[in-house]
Amino acid sequence: MEVKAIHRGARISAQKTRLVADQIRGLPIERALNILAFSPKKAAGIVKKVVESAIANAEHNEGADIDELKVKSIFVDKATSLKRFTARAKGRGNRIEKQTCHITVTLGN
């Protein structure tokens, strides 16, 4: 049994989010949530919400036992970036790209 949760367009870069995702890949749910709860990174809070959503999906849709679940796979893909401009000297402007990502979490036995 596999349960999936996806967060599309998370407002953080994929590179920063992958650092957190690599820490919990393959771990039991309880241990993964502890790591995410005590991590100081902004991405940890976002990934924790996606993992909790996957747990809720497992309970509601599949009637699964939470103690048996572990993070089967987690991956982070680059999404479209938000284009912004910032003012520079002499009336010019530079483009700033605010990165977004897609976070996919799969839980299984």
UniProtKB/Swiss-Prot annotation:
A GO molecular-function annotation = structural constituent of ribosome
The record ties this protein, via CDD domains, to:
Ribosomal_L22 (cd00336)
Tell me the Pfam families matching this sequence. Answer: Ribosomal_L22
Task: For this UniProt record, give its keywords in alphabetical order, as a comma-separated list.
Answer: Ribonucleoprotein, Ribosomal protein, RNA-binding, rRNA-binding
Q: Which cysteines are joined by disulfide bonds?
A: none
Physiological role: This protein binds specifically to 23S rRNA; its binding is stimulated by other ribosomal proteins, e.g. L4, L17, and L20. It is important during the early stages of 50S assembly. It makes multiple contacts with different domains of the 23S rRNA in the assembled 50S subunit and ribosome.
Record-given protein name: Large ribosomal subunit protein uL22
Lineage of the species this protein comes from: Bacteria, Pseudomonadati, Pseudomonadota, Betaproteobacteria, Burkholderiales
